[in-house]
Amino acid sequence: MESLPVFPNKFKAALAAKQVQIGCWSALSNPISTEVLGLAGFDWLVLDGEHAPNDISTFIPQLMALKGSASAPVVRVPTNEPVIIKRLLDIGFYNFLIPFVETKEEAEQAVASTRYPPEGIRGVSVSHRANMFGTVADYFAQSNKNITILVQIESQQGVDNVDAIAATEGVDCIFVGPSDLAAALGHLGNASHPDVQKAIQHIFNRASAHGKPSGILAPVEADARRYLEWGATFVAVGSDLGVFRSATQKLADTFKK
């Protein structure tokens, strides 16, 4: 069983090596369901702080529930804001998914928010959960180089600036938000539209051109396999909420219809 902090960051190393990482989205915001999810064998799990009802008080027990799991926890922050990111760092997250990044400057801000000076602007606390309350002697030396930053492109401006974003130092992966991207391109609710699919493939290709892996959420198996064929290495193939809803509906239908 691993304890905090986890150095070196194996998830960051796997992404850098372009090793396919299959994951699952978590939106149920409950430590029991998260613990069960952590036993399933996924490479990583996103604990969603943007669209799921999560905050510091719900994230901490979920991180505790994943202690000993082989699945790397990734937090999607609600917004690209340094204070929010600092607080999530202090409770023990090392892998960050930053939503709605549209420019190189926004990508740089995300990176800076996770690094201690002089590399960044992260505020300093000498005793918090991530450094085992001050008992890890080399935490400051190790932390900066063990943070993973995944930036989410989900707008036309983000697509237009994908090269600059992907080239940003400290950005580890380019992640596509297919639903918001579809809406931004005029196809709300239809991420399968050819225009959206073309944009997704373009993002993957440009990320690869800059030596960065790409990722996406794809709960439909055919979509996930297509994105893997296109070169995505960081793919969420479902969500705990979706699996729970589908399984319970199927169970009810088996006996009620």
From Swiss-Prot:
Superkingdom as given in the UniProt entry: Bacteria
InterPro entries assigned to the protein according to its UniProt record, in alphabetical order: Aldolase/citrate-lyase_domain, GarL, HpcH-HpaI_aldolase, Pyrv/PenolPyrv_kinase-like_dom, Pyrv_kinase-like_dom_sf
Cofactor (UniProt): Mg(2+)
Active site, UniProt feature: 51 (proton acceptor)
Enzyme class: lyase
GO biological process assignments: D-glucarate catabolic process; galactarate catabolic process
Site (Transition state stabilizer): 76
Name of protein: 5-keto-4-deoxy-D-glucarate aldolase
This protein's GO CC annotations: cytoplasm
Sites where the protein binds Mg(2+): 154, 180
Organism: Shigella boydii serotype 18 (strain CDC 3083-94 / BS512)
UniProt entry tagged with the keyword Metal-binding: yes
Cofactor note: Binds 1 Mg(2+) ion per subunit.
Family: Belongs to the HpcH/HpaI aldolase family. KDGluc aldolase subfamily.
Pathway: Carbohydrate acid metabolism; galactarate degradation; D-glycerate from galactarate: step 2/3
Role noted for this protein: Catalyzes the reversible retro-aldol cleavage of both 5-keto-4-deoxy-D-glucarate and 2-keto-3-deoxy-D-glucarate to pyruvate and tartronic semialdehyde.
Reaction(s) the record says it catalyses: 5-dehydro-4-deoxy-D-glucarate = 2-hydroxy-3-oxopropanoate + pyruvate; 2-dehydro-3-deoxy-D-glucarate = 2-hydroxy-3-oxopropanoate + pyruvate
Alphabetical UniProt keywords: Lyase, Magnesium, Metal-binding
